[in-house]
Amino acid sequence: MAQFFKAKPNRSKQLSSKLSLKVTQLDHLGAGIAHHDGKIVFINGALPDETVSVQLTEQKKKFSRGKLLKIEKRSTERVTPPCPHFDKCGGCDLQHLDIEAQRKHKANTLVDLVNKFAQTQASEVCAPLSGDAWHYRRRARLATWFDKNTKHISLGFRASSSSDVVEIQSCAVLAEPLSALIPDLAFMLNQLSGKKALGHVELTQADNGNFVVLRVTKVLSDKDKARLVEFANKHEVIVLLQDDDAQCEHLNGAGEQPFYALSGSDIKLNFSPGNFIQVNGPVNQAMVSQAVEWLSPKAGERVLDLFCGIGNFSLPLAKDGAEVIGVEGVVAMVEQARVNAKQSGLDKVAFYHADLSADLSKEPWLGKVDKMLIDPARAGAYESMQSLKKLKPKALVYVSCNPASLARDSEVILKQGYQLKKIGLIDMFPQTHHLESMALFELGN
């Protein structure tokens, strides 16, 4: 049999070539989508209805990636990002898109993913829950980087897809009092003799003040601690040092713990630096209110809240007399949730610790419930959803921070006799591609 030589494609030439492409849509990560040679081309920074000049940077069998060189035809939805760090910082990736267009894109992404992978449509697509587009974050973790040559410590956020630290002077999505702290905080940290021992810095705006948590790998000197106390007093913040064991030392504030309250109730939720909270306070309030409205728990009903954290949903669900069982995988948050329930005067709520990614069949709390709420991390709750047949809630609210895992888990839920009644976007993270969502499933006849 004759064999013929077939030249391999010149990949280096293909990658170096410049193309003019028409962008048709955004993917779920916020990258522009165009097509070339029968393949999808992903272009960060490009928007739908734009014609752009692109240089290919990566070639795969089914897709390519391109670097945006020039916008030849501009989208009417493109805006100028107000943040001076936008093109370097890895935090906000949609500042160049009008906020209403952002929300429309996210809502469409959510519905499309659920329709495609769960192969179902909700009876009702609800209006998005949203708040301020800027300065909405009440919490952020800043990275530090110590330069051995200059002895300078940089304070900022990680660059996109990199461990490099982008030094910042402000943050357009961080609460304004916290953003205003950054320049003076960075200057003060550089005055510390033990600055090499600094890790990340966590800034939090709580209802009872602003908190600065410094992660340290070694004990700081008394002189350094005195500098930190001076900074705390000047800026009216509470400063804590957190060691390798996640133990915190208050430098001022007499051991005061941050908290936030939920409006319309006497519920107050204390939290610690290691505890998860939603970063967008007003949108969190709207989200909790919607979840309670959708489930409408009543006295005498039994409600299960999986991945309950410090009680963000559990306590509001219990305020009208329903028996609520909260289950969480982090021991410290279970303990905090119990404290929060006690201080809020709620005695019909109980909290348990469990690995929600493991077999739950022998858990003492597992049994028939009337209603259920689940708020998992990005990985979703595939394992927990296998227990639905035993739990048999007549209504299930699924709060998700990842539409892909929601779509996957929805398929499991639907196969167990449930119908998707409502779904809606929760715009917890404006200026980014990240989206929160809520879905209501009801057991069919």
Curated annotation (Swiss-Prot):
UniProt keyword list: 4Fe-4S, Iron, Iron-sulfur, Metal-binding, Methyltransferase, rRNA processing, S-adenosyl-L-methionine, Transferase
Binding site for S-adenosyl-L-methionine: 278, 307, 312, 328, 355, 375
SUPFAM superfamilies linked: Nucleic acid-binding proteins, S-adenosyl-L-methionine-dependent methyltransferases
Keyword flag Iron-sulfur: yes
Catalytic activity: uridine(1939) in 23S rRNA + S-adenosyl-L-methionine = 5-methyluridine(1939) in 23S rRNA + S-adenosyl-L-homocysteine + H(+)
Keyword Lipid metabolism: no
Residues that hold [4Fe-4S] cluster according to the record: 83, 89, 92, 171
Molecular-function GO terms, alphabetical: 4 iron, 4 sulfur cluster binding; iron ion binding; RNA binding; rRNA (uridine-C5-)-methyltransferase activity
Pfam families: TRAM, tRNA_U5-meth_tr
Disulfide bonding pattern of the chain: none
Function recorded in the entry: Catalyzes the formation of 5-methyl-uridine at position 1939 (m5U1939) in 23S rRNA.
Record-stated family: Belongs to the class I-like SAM-binding methyltransferase superfamily. RNA M5U methyltransferase family. RlmD subfamily.
UniProt name for this protein: 23S rRNA (uracil(1939)-C(5))-methyltransferase RlmD
Organism from which the protein derives: Shewanella pealeana (strain ATCC 700345 / ANG-SQ1)
